[in-house]
A protein has these predicted regions:
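Aromatic- and Gly/Pro-enriched helix-to-coil junctions and flexible linker segments
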Residues: 1-62, 132-138
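Extracellular beta-rich ligand/substrate-recognition surface
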Residues: 47-54, 112-117, 178-183
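Extracellular and analogous surface-interaction loops
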Residues: 59-71, 125-130, 161, 188-200
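Extended, low-complexity, turn-rich repeat/linker tracts enriched in Gly/Pro/Ser/Thr and Asp/Glu
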Residues: 66, 79-87, 143-148
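Noncatalytic modules at the cell exterior or secretory-pathway interfaces
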Residues: 72-75, 126-144
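Short edge-strand/loop segments of extracellular domains
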Residues: 79-82, 92-101, 154-166
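A surface-exposed loop-and-adjacent beta-strand signature within N-terminal beta-sandwich domains
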Residues: 82-124
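Extracellular secretory-pathway ectodomains of glycoproteins
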Residues: 147-200
C-alpha cells in the first residue's frame, strides 16, 4: 500500500539518529590497544578514475622493525586517508619468513574488507614473526570516478611485550585448496574436533 501510494515520507521526527562511524584516519584497534608497534606500507599504486576492478600484487622487504622473534597480538589493514580508504575494497598483507632452521613460515599482518575492523587474537594466543622476511601484498581496488595517485595501503601490527610467550600459538588465517590432487590436502585430512580450543 505504501509503495502504491507513491512512497510518501514518514514523520521526520521519527528518523533514527545516524550511527557514529569510526574515524577512517585512525586505527580502529588503537582505542583498545594504543598505537601500533609498527606500520608497514605497500608500494605506491595509482588507482585509475574509471576502469574495471584493479588488482595490485607486489612483494616488499620486511626488515629493521623488530630485532628478535616476537609474538603478534593484533593486526589491521586499511587504505591511506582520505581517498585510499574509499578505493581499497579488500586485501591481504602476508609476512613470509624463515624461522632460523630453514623452515618457511607465513602469517597475515593485515586483512581488510569493506566494513571490517582489525583482527585481535584472543588473550593467551599469538602469532610468532621473525625479524626479516617479505610481505606479499594482494590488494583489490575499485575506482570511484576520481584518480587516486600513489595510494599506499597500510598494515598496523600490535605486539605482545618482549619475552612474552602465549599459551597458544597460531599462524593466523591460512589458505589451502582441499582435494587439489597429488601433494595437496584432502578434505578428510582436516579434522576439527568439536569444543576444541579456538584461536581465531
Amino acid at each position: 500500500q505504501w509503495a502504491k501510494s507513491g512512497a510518501p515520507q514518514g514523520d521526520p521526527a521519527l528518523t533514527p539518529a545516524q550511527p557514529k562511524l569510526p574515524d577512517a584516519s585512525e586505527w580502529q584497534l588503537a582505542s583498545e590497544l594504543g598505537e601500533p608497534d609498527f606500520v608497514v606500507k605497500s608500494p605506491p599504486y595509482t588507482v585509475t578514475a574509471n576502469a574495471q576492478d584493479q588488482w595490485w600484487v607486489r612483494n616488499t622487504s620486511f626488515a629493521g622493525l623488530i630485532d628478535e622473534p616476537r609474538y603478534v597480538r593484533a593486526t589491521e589493514l586499511k587504505g591511506s586517508y582520505p581517498l585510499g580508504v574509499k578505493v581499497l575494497h579488500h586485501g591481504h598483507a602476508q609476512l613470509r619468513s624463515n624461522d632460523g632452521n630453514g623452515n618457511r613460515t607465513s602469517g597475515p599482518v593485515g586483512r581488510q574488507g569493506v566494513g571490517k575492523g582489525g583482527d585481535r587474537f584472543p588473550e593467551g594466543t599469538g602469532m610468532l614473526i621473525y625479524p626479516e622476511g617479505t610481505i606479499n601484498w594482494n590488494l583489490h581496488y575499485f575506482p570511484i570516478n576520481e584518480a587516486v595517485p600513489n595510494e599506499q595501503a597500510e598494515a598496523a601490527v600490535w605486539l605482545y611485550p618482549k619475552g612474552y610467550k602465549p599459551e597458544f600459538q597460531t599462524r593466523g588465517e591460512q589458505f589451502f585448496a582441499a582435494d587439489s590432487g597429488p601433494g595437496g590436502l584432502w578434505a578428510n585430512d582436516l579434522l576439527l574436533p568439536p569444543n576444541s580450543v579456538k584461536s581465531q
